[in-house]
Amino acid sequence: MSANFLIQTVSNTPENILWHQSTVTRARREQLNGHKSYVLWFTGLSGAGKSRLAHTVEERLHRLGCRTFVLDGDNVRHGLCSDLDFSEVGRKENIRRIGEVAKLMMEVGLIVMTAFISPFRADREAVRNRMPYGDFLEIYCQVSLEACEARDVKGLYKKARAGQIKNYTGIDSAYEAPLKPELVVNTECLTLEESVSAVLRMLHERGMVVQ
């Protein structure tokens, strides 16, 4: 039995895994970037406008000279989470992975925006608890189910109503709205520009961006 094999097997246990601390800290990366890093977690039903809002906020922040990245719910299913289904277990693991990636990107010094339904409150709180206090900002894109169904360009709600899609959030799987999000954006009442302004205003008030 080779030494390499022994190392690979014992390293699977947590007590044999060491954390290697980089000499280049997050604070130094933030200083180089010229701004603080953090995570904006957009959550809401399918059709609530999460992706559109996240990408538009990113564009505005980019124009202000910020280093940014959007983790989009559909995009990660093409690679990082392509092995996961849409069962409750699969969704939990999907959010866990995204939370870890978002945390790593924040450590790099980026402003990270995530656009995921992330239907379960406990999963979102688990991600929040992995972040330093104040670095996870939950933005609830609030909209009625009726409005989401009216916006349903993919036809997914219609398929879920017909029983062709199982465990679809809002139809036969619950969405647990945030209890104390940092911001609620009613995308049913507000225009896209008004929604973007609400996000930027929150960041400005917290000293996280200069408008």
Curated annotation (Swiss-Prot):
<dbReference type="InterPro" id="IPR002891">
    <property type="entry name" value="APS_kinase"/>
</dbReference>
<keyword id="KW-0597">Phosphoprotein</keyword>
<dbReference type="GO" id="GO:0005524">
    <property type="term" value="F:ATP binding"/>
</dbReference>
<dbReference type="GO" id="GO:0004020">
    <property type="term" value="F:adenylylsulfate kinase activity"/>
</dbReference>
<comment type="function">
    <text>Catalyzes the synthesis of activated sulfate.</text>
</comment>
<keyword id="KW-0418">Kinase</keyword>
<comment type="pathway">
    <text>Sulfur metabolism; hydrogen sulfide biosynthesis; sulfite from sulfate: step 2/3.</text>
</comment>
<dbReference type="InterPro" id="IPR027417">
    <property type="entry name" value="P-loop_NTPase"/>
</dbReference>
<dbReference type="GO" id="GO:0000103">
    <property type="term" value="P:sulfate assimilation"/>
</dbReference>
<keyword id="KW-0547">Nucleotide-binding</keyword>
<keyword id="KW-0067">ATP-binding</keyword>
<protein>
    <recommendedName>
        <fullName>Adenylyl-sulfate kinase</fullName>
        <ecNumber>2.7.1.25</ecNumber>
    </recommendedName>
</protein>
<comment type="similarity">
    <text>Belongs to the APS kinase family.</text>
</comment>
<feature type="active site" description="Phosphoserine intermediate">
    <location>
        <position position="118"/>
    </location>
</feature>
<dbReference type="GO" id="GO:0070814">
    <property type="term" value="P:hydrogen sulfide biosynthetic process"/>
</dbReference>
<keyword id="KW-0808">Transferase</keyword>
<dbReference type="Pfam" id="PF01583">
    <property type="entry name" value="APS_kinase"/>
</dbReference>
<feature type="binding site">
    <location>
        <begin position="44"/>
        <end position="51"/>
    </location>
    <ligand>
        <name>ATP</name>
    </ligand>
</feature>
